[in-house]
Amino acid sequence: MILETPDFQAYRGQEPPRFANKAELECAKVLDYYGVPWEYEPKTFVLEQDEDGRVVEAFKPDFYLPEQNLYVEVTVMKQSLVTRKNRKLRKLRERYPEVRIKLFYKRDIERLAERYQLELAS
């Protein structure tokens, strides 16, 4: 899915962001509106490698907020399908304890959308 993106002022990435879903786009708009510097999917964290050193599992958080040194992952999956993502986050925290990351669930995004009158796909 390719979503048309506005001309972001607080975006700090090298390439224009290509959001995976409308929730990510709307979160980016909120960050930008408040002037919070952000990057989109700037880093991939290796979670597991095979015996030859090939990456078996990795995780790429949606946003990085450099001034807060915080990664943000947005998930709009049904709560019952979030188990795999939570497992990846646990692995990331075990392997990279210095990395700060926050997961926003579908209900968090819905509350954000209601509060800021965002247009999110159901």
Language-model regions: role of each:
Residues 1-122:
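Electrostatic, structured charged patches in enzyme active sites and in nucleic-acid/phosphate-binding
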